[in-house]
From Swiss-Prot:
The gene is prfC. This is Peptide chain release factor 3. The keyword Mitochondrion does not apply. It comes from Neisseria meningitidis serogroup A / serotype 4A (strain DSM 15465 / Z2491). It is found in: Cytoplasm. Residues 10-278 form the tr-type G domain. InterPro entries: EF-G-like_DII, EFG_III/V, G_TR_CS, P-loop_NTPase, PrfC, RF3_C, RF3_dom_3_sf, RF3_GTP-bd.
Length: 531
């Protein structure tokens, strides 16, 4: 291993921000970029009338709705580290793309709206993090408003999300009486002042919880703070780095993203505590990040990131070695060598050509239709990385088009959107209409909008009487053939060529599973692995 690769890997931090919709995730993303010096002023999704859109929300439909639909990737330097920040779709309808992004990160920052507490989407996302024991940092947001009791919020995280909390900062008041936070580990009080343009050096700090200056600053709140801190230190967990890295304990910070307050502490904790890139599982062996040879996997494909270019970009997480522009790398699924000359790195939709990249970095490869989610790349070794799942869709629609002459454009559009993971596409074994599967209604709206804007196709979606899908497999080819013959009306082939059973209701699925005990019904399937 070269010292250069080892040093670069140690400098890397790759994390995603996860939250329930409207918890303030996109605002926090902007502020992290602002504090790191990566951008000069933060746009916010709420300021729709000003035309100032958030850096990380770039697709038309996102600009119209003010939600993050596609996951963006942003790289910036902070305190001699290179940070790769993946902003995930917060809207509940985009959970599948979010799940996949979580396969490409080494840690996650969970944002909770302190007025609402733990919400449904947060629970789902944390369960995906738990599959890989991803370390989690927690930010309780919106303390400039009236919020719930802080101890109650910690209890809720521990009980519902089943992860122990270690408060690192503690709020002093809330809403109009929000005075700041006490940093438990540093024994410092950071004083809050409202205003979205303040930078970290502009917040006052008072050293020591027993400092007499505090009585003068806020005589009413200081005794309550001291009582609460005594209670917190007796009742909650101390921060422990090993337990954090094992995904068992989360450090908790309090603040107000819109007012830039509490951001600095989060950034510092991610640099200091979050792990550098970790080894990754491949089918043949474990791949270490500081190995000399380059390897990586595709976790997302995004069509038409730039309306001027009409292109598709495959997002690759580097797992080992060093990527250099122009190097030859092997696309293992199709056994083809490609010269990587026009690979890009991201600041949301702003792109720059990559000269080099190391484990933990996310790079974009122009894709003309050959690359699929889950594909692995290396300098030649047959490595297929594992752990990139498709999830069984929960909503289904059949597709028709208003102009039958545009059937080819429809098929091309759905093929591309299916590969990208925007929607799952099933071709029934009997019947002509294609079936689309998604995890939320808004996904269908996005597909309608993108078919119209990018492929010139007006599509109509009708409800399909399908309750759920399961991918099916069987080691006994004869039994599988019997199953196919008996259930042809409920079977379809997905975009990856896999056989799926489309169940009209829960009872039907249960009975079918009982009737065919040798057939395996899968709720997830691995990308790039045929069942």
């Amino acid at each position: 291993m070269s010292q250069e690769i080892l040093d670069q890997v140690r400098r890397r931090r790759t994390f995603a921000i996860i939250s329930h919709p409207d918890a303030g995730k996109t605002t926090l993303t902007e502020k992290l970029l602002l504090f790191s010096g990566a951008i000069q002023s933060a746009g916010t999704v709420k300021g729709k009338k000003t035309g100032k859109f958030a850096t990380s929300d770039w697709m038309d439909i996102e600009k119209q709705r003010g939600i993050s639909v596609a996951s963006s990737v942003m790289q910036f330097d902070y305190k001699d580290h290179t940070v790769n920040l993946l902003d995930t779709p917060g809207h509940q309808d985009f959970s599948e793309d979010t799940y996949r992004v979580l396969t490409a990160v080494d840690s996650a920052l969970m944002v909770i709206d302190a007025a609402k507490g733990v919400e449904a989407q947060t629970i789902k996302l944390l369960n995906v993090c738990r599959l890989r024991n991803t370390p989690i940092v927690t930010f309780m947001n919106k303390y400039d408003r009236e919020v719930r009791d802080s101890l109650e919020l910690l209890d809720e995280v521990e009980n519902i999300l089943q992860i122990r909390c270690a408060p690192v900062t503690w709020p002093i008041g809330m809403g109009k009486n929000f005075k700041g936070v006490y940093h438990i580990l540093n024994d410092e009080i950071y004083l809050f002042e409202a205003g979205g343009e303040r930078l970290p050096h502009e917040f006052d700090i008072i050293k020591g919880i027993d400092n007499p200056e505090l009585e003068q600053r806020f005589p009413l709140e200081i005794q309550q703070l001291r009582d609460e801190i005594e209670l917190v230190q007796a009742a909650s967990n101390e921060f422990n780095l090993d337990e954090f890295l094992a995904g068992e304990l989360t450090p908790v910070f309090f603040g107000s993203a819109i007012n830039n307050f509490g951001i600095q502490e989060i950034l510092n904790s991610l640099i200091e505590w979050a792990p550098a890139p970790k080894p990754r599982d491949a089918t043949v062996r474990m791949v270490e990040p500081d190995e000399p040879k380059f390897s990586g996997f595709i976790f997302k494909i995004q069509a038409n990131m730039d309306p001027k270019h009409r292109d598709r970009i495959a997002f690759l997480r580097v797992c080992s070695g060093k990527f250099e522009r122009g190097m030859k790398m092997k696309h293992l699924r199709i056994n083809r060598e490609i010269a990587a000359s026009s690979v890009v790195t991201f600041m949301s939709h702003d792109r720059e050509l990559v000269e080099e990249a190391y484990a933990g970095d996310i790079i974009g490869i122009p894709n003309h239709g050959n690359i699929q989610i889950g594909d692995s790349f290396s300098e030649g070794e047959q490595l297929t990385f594992t752990g990139i799942p498709f999830f069984a869709p929960e909503l289904f629609r059949s597709v028709r088009i208003k102009n039958p002459l545009k059937i080819k454009q429809l098929q091309k559009g759905l093929q591309q959107l299916g590969e990208e993971g925007a929607v799952q596409v099933f071709k029934p074994m009997s019947g002509a209409d294609l079936i689309l599967g998604a995890v939320g209604v808004l996904q269908f709206e996005v597909v309608t909008s993108r078919l119209a804007n990018e492929y010139g196709v007006e599509a109509v979606f009708d409800n399909a009487s399908i309750w759920s899908a399961r991918w099916v497999s069987c080691d006994d080819k004869k039994k599988l053939a019997e199953f196919e013959k008996a259930n042809a009306g409920n079977l379809a082939i997905d975009a990856g060529g896999n056989l799926a059973y489309l169940a009209p209701n829960r009872v039907n699925l249960g009975l079918t599973q009982e009737r065919w005990p040798d057939i395996v019904f899968h709720e997830t399937r691995e990308h790039s692995v045929k069942l």
